[in-house]
C-alpha cells in the first residue's frame, strides 16, 4: 500500500524532514511587511504544490506507468510534442523586464527632476502672466526651456549609465544553448534542453548540467554539485536508492541546473521549467519586493526641504508685496521668481554624474553596480549577511594539516601554496605522499602546462582536486608518477564502504610486489590497520598509537576540517605474482592488517584579504553575520579564522566545554558570540530572533535554508539596519532582492542571483564589499559637501529679489544671470567634489542611521543658508553698491527707486550728484551691477569650494592640491566668468557687460573671511568633540 504523499519545504541543508505544516507561521517572520514584499497567498499555495512529490518512493515500473514512458525506449516523438505543447518549454520564466521607455521616463521624473519640471512650468506661467499684462520678457521662456533641457540631458545620461550596467549583466548569460542526451523512439538523440518534457529518459555524465528535475533509474559512480541550490560545493553521491522521506534529500533525485561532477546516470524527467525546485525558488524571489534605496529617500527628503523653503519664502514675500500695494500680478511674478531662485538647477546633473563616477571607480575595483543609487546604499550598510563559500573563502578545498610521525604539521593554504614548511625528509612522508598521489582519480585537463598549478582545471570532485594540486606542487608531475606506478585495480569511494582503494605496480624494477593504497574516513581506515608507520618504520598499532590518532583526529575535526586517513600494504609477491588478476567485485585480496601512515585534513580556506576586511567592518561599526548552509563546526572555524568571531569571544558551547558542564547550564548572556543552526532558527519566534540579533554582536547561522536567509534579512531590517546580503546560488535570490543591497558573485553566481542583486562582485571577494562600503560612505560625504556648496549661493541669489521687493532697489541680479551661476560657473566645481578623497575618520565612524543621519540635516541647512550664505550675500551687495556709488548713486538714493528706474518713459532720472540718466544708460548700469554681483558670488564660491573639501579636518590636513579636479573647477569658474563678461558682454540679451578690473577684487576679503571662519569652525569641532559646537556646527 502506497504511503500518503507528504509536502516538504525547501530546507535544503537541514538534517531532518521539515514539513510545511511547521512553516505555516512563515508570515510571522516577515516582520509585517507590505503585501508587495512577499508572494501572495495563492502564489504560495501554488509553490507548495510544486513539491508535492512521491516519485522518489516509486519503483521503476510504477514510475514508467505514472509518466507513460519506457526506460529502454523513452517517449515517442509524437507524445513528446504533445507534452511540450501542454507544459511549455523547459526553461525558467525570465523575470519581468521593465520596458526601456518606462526606465527612461523614470529618470525624467524622479527626485530632483520633479523640482526642475515645476520650476520650468512656473517660468512659463510667469511669462503668460507678464504677456497678459503687456510687460512680457522672454527671460522666463529661456529659463523654463533651459530647465527642461537640464532634466532631459541628465535623464539621458543616467539612463545611459544604467543601460550600460544592464548590458554587462546580459553578457553574463550563457550564450550557448544547453543540449540534452535523450532517448526517444528507442533512439538516443541530442536535443535542446528546452524541449525536454516530463517522462523523457535522459542520460548524463561527468561535466553535464542536469537539464531538468529527474528521478534516477541507473547510476554508476554519479556525484553532483548542488551548490546552485545549497550554496555549498561538497559533492553529493547520487544513486537509484530511495534513502530519505524528504524528496530534497533522497539520493535518487537530480535537480535542474545542478552539475554532474563524475560518473554516469540515467533518469526520467519528473519536472520541467518553473515546476522544478530551482523554478520554485526563482518564483519566491520574484514575489519579494525591492525597497526604496536610502539615497532615493534622502533626495526625496532634500526636495521636500528645498520646496518647503522656496514656497514658504515665496508666499511670505508674496503677502509682503501685496501689503506694500504692489499689483497682484507683479506679486505673483515675485513669488515665481523667488521659488525658481531657490531651485538648485545644477544639482540634478551633479548628483547623477557623482553617482556615475563612483560606479566607474567601483567597477575598477571589481564591483559592478547595476543601479546607481545602490552605490550610496552600500555606504549606509550597518549589517552584512555574508555567504561563506567563495565569498569569505577561496571556494576550493585545500590541504590544511597533516598528521604523521605523531605530529600535526600545518600546510600552506595561501592562493599559490608555495611555502610548505613541514618536514619532507621523513620516510613516513615519502609513503604518505605516494598514497595521496596514487589513491586519487582526479586529473588535470590536458594542454594546461603553462597555467599555474593552482589555477588549472581539474576533472574530479573538490577533495580529490585539492589532493591532486597539493601533490603536484610538492612532488612535481603527478601524471608521470602515476604512469610509473601503473594502476591495475580500483574500488572507488562509496557511502557504504567510506574508503577508496587502488592497487599499483611499483616503479622500482627490483621490487615485484604490488602496492595497495587506501584512503577514507579515518575511523574506517584505522579499523583496517594492525600497524602504524613512525619515522619510516612499521610498528604495531598499540593503544598509545591509537590514542594519539584519536587526539589528532578530534583536534583537526574540531577545526571544522574534513579529515581523511591513509594506509597502504605491500602485497607479498609469492601470493600475488605479476600475472595475478585482481577482482574488485569478489575482492580476492586482503583489505585488513594494513599499515596506517597518516591523516590529512582539508578546508576551503579564507581568502587572505578577508580578516583585514572584517576588521575594517568592525572599526566602521558594521556587524558581519555569516549565513551558510555548511556544518556549524566548519562555519565556526572559518568565522574565527577571519575574525567574524573574535579570538577572545566565546559561544555558549565554548563556555560549556571550558567549564566541562552541559550547554543548558550556561547563562546565554555570558556568551559574546552565537552559532545558530537552521533547525534552531526554525523553532524561533520573530521576537526570539530579534533578541538574538540585538544581544549578540558576533553571529554565525549554519545549515540555513533559502527561506531562513530571507527571515534573517527581515529580522535585521526590523532593527532599522541597512542590510547588505551576499549570495551566489538561486537559493540566495529571495534574500538578495529583499535586502537593502543585494550583492551577487560574478564568477560563481547563478543568473538568478545576478538578476536579483543590486551589485555584482566580479572577483567574488568579500574585501571588495568593504572597498564598496568606503566608496559608498565617501559618496554620501561628497554629496553632502556638494549640496552644502550648491545651497550656499542660493541665499546670495535670493536676497537680491527680496531687497528688490522690500526696499525697491534696481534689480541686483536677474534670473538669466542666476542660471549662468547654477549651470555655468558651478557645475564643474560641484562635480569636482565627487573626486575628493576620504577624510581620515571615514571608516572609523558608525554607519549612518537611515532615519536620523540625513543627507541634508538642520546643521547643513543653517550653516549653508545663514552662515556662509549670508556672508556671500553681503559680499555681493558690497560690490553692487560699490558699482552704483562710483557711477553717482549712493546706497540711500537707491531705496524705493525701482518704479522710476524701470519706467521706460523717464529719460532724465537724477543720481546723487544731479546727473541725468536715460532709460538705456540706467539699463546698462543695471547690467554692470548684475555682472559685478555675479562675479562677487563666483569669487566667494571659490572659497566655498575649497572649504567644502572637508567637514571636520583642516584643509591643510586634507591637502590643498590632492584633488586636482577642484583646481580644474576653479579655473573653469574664472574662464566662464571672463567669457561672459568680456567675450559676451556686448550681447544685451544675456544682461552682461565688460567690468572694470577693480570690481573683480572687491569681494576677495569676504572670500578670505569665509575660509578663516570655516577653519575656526572645524578647529573647535576637533578640539571639543561632543560639545554644543560639535553637535550644532558639524553637518
UniProtKB/Swiss-Prot annotation:
Mg(2+) binds at residues 728, 732. It comes from the Eukaryota. Signal peptide: none annotated. Belongs to the cation transport ATPase (P-type) (TC 3.A.3) family. Type IIC subfamily. Found in skin, kidney and distal colon. Keywords: ATP-binding, Cell membrane, Hydrogen ion transport, Ion transport, Magnesium, Membrane, Metal-binding, Nucleotide-binding, Phosphoprotein, Potassium, Potassium transport, Sodium, Sodium transport, Translocase, Transmembrane, Transmembrane helix, Transport. Its EC number is 7.2.2.19, 7.2.2.13. Induction: Up-regulated in kidney and down-regulated in colon in response to K(+) ion free diet. GO terms for molecular function: ATP binding; ATP hydrolysis activity; metal ion binding; P-type potassium:proton transporter activity; P-type sodium:potassium-exchanging transporter activity. GO terms for biological process: potassium ion homeostasis; regulation of pH. Gene3D superfamilies: Calcium-transporting ATPase, cytoplasmic domain N, Calcium-transporting ATPase, cytoplasmic transduction domain A, Calcium-transporting ATPase, transmembrane domain, HAD superfamily/HAD-like. Residues 121-142, 320-331, 804-813, 878-929, 983-997 are lumenal. It catalyses: K(+)(out) + ATP + H2O + H(+)(in) = K(+)(in) + ADP + phosphate + 2 H(+)(out); K(+)(out) + Na(+)(in) + ATP + H2O = K(+)(in) + Na(+)(out) + ADP + phosphate + H(+). Disruption phenotype: Mice are born at the expected Mendelian rate. It comes from Mus musculus (Mouse). It is a multi-pass membrane protein. Residues 1-99, 164-299, 350-783, 835-854, 950-963, 1019-1035 are cytoplasmic. NCBIfam families: ATPase-IIC_X-K, ATPase_P-type. Residues 22-49 are annotated as: Disordered. The active site is at 387 (4-aspartylphosphate intermediate). The modification Phosphoserine is found at residue 954. This is Potassium-transporting ATPase alpha chain 2. The ATPase pump is composed of a catalytic alpha subunit and an auxiliary non-catalytic beta subunit. The alpha subunit pairs with the beta subunit of gastric H(+)/K(+) ATPase ATP4B or the beta subunit of Na(+)/K(+) ATPases ATP1B1 and ATP1B3; this interaction is required for the formation of a functionally active pump and its targeting at the plasma membrane. The keyword Protein transport does not apply. GO terms for cellular component: actin cytoskeleton; apical plasma membrane; basolateral plasma membrane; cytosol. The catalytic subunit of a H(+)/K(+) ATPase and/or Na(+)/K(+) ATPase pump which transports K(+) ions in exchange for Na(+) and/or H(+) ions across the apical membrane of epithelial cells. Uses ATP as an energy source to pump K(+) ions into the cell while transporting Na(+) and/or H(+) ions to the extracellular compartment. Involved in the maintenance of electrolyte homeostasis through K(+) ion absorption in kidney and colon. In the airway epithelium, may play a primary role in mucus acidification regulating its viscosity and clearance.
Amino acid at each position: 500500500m502506497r504511503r500518503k504523499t507528504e509536502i516538504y519545504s525547501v530546507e535544503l541543508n537541514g538534517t531532518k524532514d521539515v514539513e510545511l505544516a511547521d512553516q505555516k507561521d512563515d508570515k510571522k517572520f516577515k516582520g509585517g511587511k507590505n503585501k508587495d514584499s512577499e508572494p501572495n497567498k495563492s502564489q504560495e499555495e501554488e509553490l507548495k504544490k510544486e513539491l508535492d512529490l512521491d516519485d522518489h518512493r516509486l519503483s521503476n515500473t510504477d514510475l514508467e506507468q505514472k509518466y507513460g514512458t519506457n526506460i529502454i525506449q523513452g517517449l515517442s516523438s509524437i507524445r513528446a510534442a504533445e507534452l511540450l505543447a501542454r507544459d511549455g518549454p523547459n526553461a525558467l520564466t525570465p523575470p519581468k523586464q521593465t520596458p526601456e521607455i518606462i526606465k527612461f521616463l523614470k529618470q525624467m521624473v524622479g527626485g530632483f527632476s520633479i523640482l526642475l519640471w515645476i520650476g520650468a512650468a512656473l517660468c512659463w506661467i510667469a511669462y503668460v502672466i507678464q504677456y497678459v499684462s503687456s510687460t512680457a520678457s522672454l527671460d522666463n521662456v529661456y529659463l523654463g526651456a533651459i530647465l527642461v533641457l537640464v532634466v532631459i540631458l541628465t535623464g539621458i545620461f543616467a539612463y545611459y549609465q544604467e543601460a550600460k550596467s544592464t548590458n554587462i549583466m546580459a553578457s553574463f548569460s550563457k550564450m550557448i544553448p544547453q543540449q540534452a542526451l535523450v532517448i526517444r523512439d528507442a533512439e538516443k538523440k541530442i536535443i535542446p534542453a528546452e524541449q525536454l518534457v516530463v517522462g523523457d529518459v535522459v542520460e548524463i555524465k561527468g561535466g553535464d548540467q542536469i537539464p531538468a528535475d529527474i528521478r534516477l533509474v541507473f547510476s554508476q559512480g554519479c556525484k553532483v554539485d548542488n551548490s546552485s541550490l545549497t550554496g555549498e560545493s561538497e559533492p553529493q553521491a547520487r544513486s537509484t536508492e530511495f534513502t530519505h522521506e524528504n524528496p530534497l534529500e533522497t539520493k535518487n533525485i537530480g535537480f535542474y541546473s545542478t552539475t554532474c561532477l563524475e560518473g554516469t546516470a540515467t533518469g526520467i524527467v519528473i519536472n520541467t521549467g518553473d515546476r522544478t525546485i530551482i523554478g520554485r525558488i526563482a518564483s519566491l524571489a520574484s514575489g519579494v519586493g525591492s525597497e526604496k534605496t536610502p539615497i532615493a529617500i534622502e533626495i526625496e527628503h532634500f526636495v521636500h526641504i528645498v520646496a518647503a523653503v522656496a514656497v514658504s519664502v515665496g508666499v511670505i514675500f508674496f503677502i509682503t508685496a501685496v501689503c506694500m500695494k504692489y499689483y497682484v500680478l507683479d506679486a505673483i511674478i515675485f513669488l515665481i521668481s523667488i521659488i525658481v531662485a531657490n531651485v538648485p538647477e545644477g544639482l540634478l546633473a551633479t548628483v547623477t554624474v557623482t553617482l556615475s563616477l563612483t560606479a566607474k571607480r567601483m567597477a575598477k575595483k571589481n564591483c559592478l553596480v547595476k543601479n546607481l543609487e545602490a552605490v550610496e546604499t552600500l555606504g549606509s550598510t550597518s549589517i552584512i549577511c555574508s555567504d561563506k563559500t567563495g565569498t569569505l573563502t577561496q571556494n576550493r578545498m585545500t590541504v590544511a594539516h597533516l598528521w604523521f610521525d605523531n605530529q600535526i604539521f600545518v600546510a600552506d593554504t595561501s592562493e599559490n601554496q608555495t611555502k610548505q614548511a613541514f618536514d619532507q625528509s621523513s620516510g613516513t612522508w615519502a609513503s604518505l605522499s605516494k598514497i595521496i598521489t596514487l589513491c586519487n582519480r582526479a586529473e588535470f585537463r590536458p594542454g594546461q602546462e603553462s597555467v599555474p598549478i593552482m589555477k588549472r582545471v581539474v576533472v574530479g570532485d573538490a577533495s580529490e582536486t585539492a589532493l591532486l594540486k597539493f601533490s603536484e606542487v610538492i612532488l612535481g608531475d603527478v601524471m608521470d608518477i602515476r604512469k610509473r606506478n601503473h594502476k591495475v585495480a580500483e574500488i572507488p569511494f562509496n557511502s557504504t564502504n567510506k574508503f577508496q582503494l587502488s592497487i599499483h605496480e611499483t616503479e622500482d624494477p627490483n621490487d615485484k610486489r604490488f602496492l595497495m593504497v587506501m584512503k577514507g574516513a579515518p575511523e574506517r581506515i584505522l579499523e583496517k590497520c594492525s600497524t602504524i608507520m613512525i619515522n619510516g618504520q612499521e610498528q604495531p598499532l598499540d593503544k598509545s598509537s591509537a590514542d594519539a590518532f584519536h587526539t589528532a583526529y578530534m583536534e583537526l575535526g574540531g577545526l571544522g576540517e574534513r579529515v581523511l586517513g591513509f594506509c597502504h600494504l605491500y602485497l607479498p609477491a609469492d601470493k600475488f605474482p605479476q600475472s595475478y588478476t585482481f577482482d574488485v567485485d569478489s575482492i580476492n585480496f586482503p583489505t585488513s592488517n594494513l599499515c596506517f601512515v597518516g591523516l590529512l585534513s582539508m578546508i576551503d580556506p579564507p581568502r587572505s584579504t578577508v580578516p583585514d576586511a572584517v576588521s575594517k567592518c568592525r572599526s566602521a561599526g558594521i556587524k558581519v553575520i555569516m549565513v551558510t548552509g555548511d556544518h556549524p563546526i566548519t562555519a565556526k572555524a572559518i568565522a574565527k579564522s577571519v575574525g567574524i568571531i573574535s579570538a577572545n569571544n566565546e559561544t555558549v558551547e565554548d563556555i560549556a566545554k571550558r567549564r566541562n558542564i552541559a550547554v543548558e547550564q550556561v547563562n546565554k548572556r555570558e556568551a559574546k558570540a552565537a552559532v545558530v543552526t537552521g533547525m534552531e532558527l526554525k523553532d524561533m519566534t520573530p521576537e526570539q530572533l530579534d533578541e538574538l540579533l540585538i544581544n549578540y554582536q558576533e553571529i554565525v547561522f549554519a545549515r540555513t535554508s533559502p527561506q531562513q536567509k530571507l527571515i534573517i534579512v527581515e529580522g535585521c531590517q526590523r532593527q532599522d539596519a541597512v542590510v547588505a546580503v551576499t549570495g551566489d546560488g538561486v537559493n540566495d535570490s529571495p534574500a538578495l532582492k529583499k535586502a537593502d543591497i543585494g550583492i551577487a558573485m560574478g564568477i560563481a553566481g547563478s543568473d538568478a542571483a545576478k538578476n536579483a542583486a543590486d551589485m555584482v562582485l566580479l572577483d567574488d571577494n568579500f574585501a571588495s564589499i568593504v572597498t564598496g562600503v568606503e566608496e559608498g560612505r565617501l559618496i554620501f560625504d561628497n554629496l553632502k559637501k556638494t549640496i552644502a556648496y550648491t545651497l550656499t549661493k542660493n541665499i546670495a541669489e535670493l536676497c537680491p529679489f527680496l531687497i528688490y521687493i522690500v526696499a525697491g532697489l534696481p534689480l541686483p541680479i536677474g534670473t538669466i544671470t542666476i542660471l549662468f551661476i547654477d549651470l555655468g560657473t558651478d557645475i564643474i566645481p560641484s562635480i569636482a567634489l565627487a573626486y575628493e578623497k576620504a577624510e581620515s575618520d571615514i571608516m572609523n565612524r558608525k554607519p549612518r542611521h537611515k532615519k536620523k543621519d540625513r543627507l541634508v540635516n538642520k546643521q547643513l541647512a543653517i550653516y549653508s543658508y545663514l552662515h556662509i550664505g549670508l556672508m556671500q550675500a553681503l559680499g555681493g551687495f558690497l560690490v553692487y553698491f560699490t558699482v552704483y556709488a562710483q557711477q553717482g548713486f549712493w546706497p540711500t538714493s537707491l531705496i524705493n527707486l525701482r518704479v522710476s528706474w524701470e519706467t521706460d518713459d523717464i529719460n532724465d532720472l537724477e543720481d546723487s550728484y544731479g546727473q541725468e540718466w536715460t532709460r538705456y544708460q540706467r539699463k546698462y548700469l543695471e547690467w554692470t551691477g548684475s555682472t559685478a554681483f555675479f562675479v562677487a558670488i563666483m569669487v566667494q564660491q571659490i572659497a566655498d569650494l575649497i572649504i567644502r573639501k572637508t567637514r571636520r579636518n583642516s584643509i591643510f590636513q586634507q591637502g590643498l592640491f590632492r584633488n586636482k579636479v577642484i583646481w580644474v573647477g576653479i579655473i573653469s569658474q574664472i574662464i566662464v566668468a571672463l567669457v561672459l563678461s568680456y567675450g559676451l558682454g556686448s550681447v544685451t540679451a544675456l544682461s552682461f557687460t565688460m567690468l572694470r578690473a577693480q570690481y573683480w577684487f572687491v569681494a576677495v576679503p569676504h572670500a578670505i573671511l569665509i575660509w578663516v571662519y570655516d577653519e575656526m569652525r572645524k578647529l573647535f569641532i576637533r578640539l571639543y568633540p561632543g560639545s554644543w559646537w560639535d553637535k550644532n556646527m558639524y553637518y
